[in-house]
Amino acid sequence: MDRYWEQFKTPFICFAGHSGVGKTTLLEHLTRRFKADQIRVGYYKHDSHRFQMDKPGKDTHRCLEAGAGIVTINDPAHFAVIAENPFKKRSITHALEQCDCILIEGYKQSPFAKIVFLDHEGKLPISQEDTGIQAVVHQGVIDNKSLTERGIPLFHRDETDRIYEFVKDYFYRCAAPLYGAVFTGGQSKRMGRPKFALEYNGRSETERMVDLLVPLCDKVFISTRKDQDLGTLDDLTHCQRINDEHTGLGPVGGLATLMGQHPKNAWLITACDMPFLQTDNLAAIIQERDPLRYGTCFMQKDRIGVEPMCAIYEPKFIVPLFESMSRRELSLSRIINDLPFKHVKVQDRFRGNFMNTNTHEEYEVARAKREQETPR
């Protein structure tokens, strides 16, 4: 069995049953529905027999027969890869992790989550004790009362729309727990003083940001440099401190540290220098969160740019993040723009909420404006 599936961060489910029970027909329908809903679905066929995708005599087939480990071909609309088994793990993971979700045909003996098809006599193809069974598809005959007694959902194979909704709901229920983090590790060179210590209405802005995140996230952290003295912020009891392990790389290094230490969690991050950010903004992005994408971020009007420092990053973002970091590509905005993120349009009345303060003059303007408002 291919154990690398256990490490997948993209949700998947197997469709298991004997030949002729309608697996491929159902998967074809589900694929069309996901496509119609603009969900990037992947399909994986686990075949215990040999298969052939190339044609003898073609250039690619000749080179594969000559000993090429990987053969690829592309045209303006498609590409294909045929590889020998030693290349399988990285080839499959790199290809399928880009999808929002994955439908697998096969793996009936695996421990993975699966939808099982009964045969025409209503018999299971695997043990009824299999803990991976999420639902059962039948042809009108069910020869196993324990399925009903255990509360396992039962679908006739013609109930394709109900099965689609069940599968889609299963994928969204796989969403990772959400952690929050306030980034305070910047050098603050233009400000001339640590931005994490700036106060508005007599209160630290970093502490305000922590308080905004606490009711919305399972845990909250302050992301900072190891040599940074946070003063009284270190005494906060409702958040934890995480020191950057990748120094000198800006927010990319901070996020890589967070995701490296907590790889099974999604992250809602904010900066410590956004004095007009409100609870409504954070609640909005959580409500719009799409856990099947690499993340969810705000997009400014007319698509002039994303807001990487008020965004949700899903666990699968760790792969392109570390790849970009290894190439010294240190712009979160550019990484986001290369990936299928969900974009949330910033409402006109909130456009100013994402302004950050980088200089003393900007801070004084923001401080004066905040003093005219009710402290948040």
Please provide the spans of the model-predicted regions.
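Phosphate/Mg2+-binding loops and adjacent switch elements
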Residues: 101-169, 173
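N-terminal phosphate/diphosphate-binding loop that engages ATP/GTP or pyrophosphate donors
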Residues: 31-84
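Short, basic/aromatic-enriched C-terminal tail that caps enzymatic domains
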Residues: 157, 161-170, 354-376
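Phosphate-binding/switch loop-helix module in NTP-utilizing enzymes
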Residues: 82-110
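Nucleotide and nucleotide-moiety/phosphate-recognizing core
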Residues: 34, 58, 177-329, 337-350, ...
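Short, charged/polar "capping" segments at the starts of alpha-helices
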Residues: 51-53, 123-125, 141-147, 211, ...
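Short internal beta-strands
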Residues: 43-45, 73-74, 134-140, 221-225, ...
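Walker A (P-loop) phosphate-binding motif
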Residues: 2-49, 176-181
